[in-house]
Amino acid sequence: MKLKSFGVFGNPIKHSKSPLIHNACFLTFQKELGFLGHYHPILLPLESRIKNEFLHLGLSGANVTLPFKERAFQICDKIKGIALECASVNTLVLENDELVGYNTDALGFYLSLKHQNYQNDQNALILGAGGSAKALACGLQKQGLKVSVLNRSARGLDFFQRLGCDCFMEPPKSAFDLIINATSASLHNELPLNKEVLKGYFKESKLAYDLAYGFLTPFLSLAKELKIPFQDGKDMLIYQASLSFEKFSDSQIPYSKAFEVMRSVF
């Protein structure tokens, strides 16, 4: 049986559960796919050229995580779907010798909220302005939520302004129903915002959501302490991964089937 290689680019990357859940799917569906896929973590130096690495490794597809999603958008031969709007790519697929970029974060995040029966008619504050934040802002706006973005610097905020989001470099004196940590602070065991400011937001919120997964982050720990409903990024990971797997399988395996397999192993 033919072997195809896949992977996930990131820095850091050793924490990623993507290899676990994707390899479970490749093993489960190898008969339907007609090939055996192997998916591995790829630690990418910050200065690396993503497209060169992809081709050099002979990959058929890959996911992209921190901090490369915006750079991945720039190196694709083609961009499809909502990735065109959010200028962020988390899924790369080699199609007819062209590197095609997709974004499954936006829909993956929405499906994870829907899974928790979260209501759409509310407002959200996104902390951070990177590739994940862009995808979430696009996705949430499509679902009718009012989106605000708080970032420590002006870098990247012009995108959100063009999108119609309220943008801040200092914490706004407003209340938000959904507080999303889309920064990398949790990977460094830090809060994304001053603790007292974050407490104030949490006390007025209905859900605290951290894109990090696999451990109780300082962000989620504070929400738990204040008895605020909270959620980590596990469901989003599995939903976006199952949507990516559908792309890797050339739509032979619906994301719903991939989701069930991935959920069973993580």
Curated annotation (Swiss-Prot):
SUPFAM superfamilies in the cross-refs: Aminoacid dehydrogenase-like, N-terminal domain, NAD(P)-binding Rossmann-fold domains
Disulphide connectivity of cysteines: none
Entry keyword annotation includes NADP: yes
One GO BP: aromatic amino acid family biosynthetic process
A GO cellular component annotation in the UniProt record: cytosol
Signal peptide: none
Quaternary state and interactors: Homodimer.
Official protein name in the record: Shikimate dehydrogenase (NADP(+))
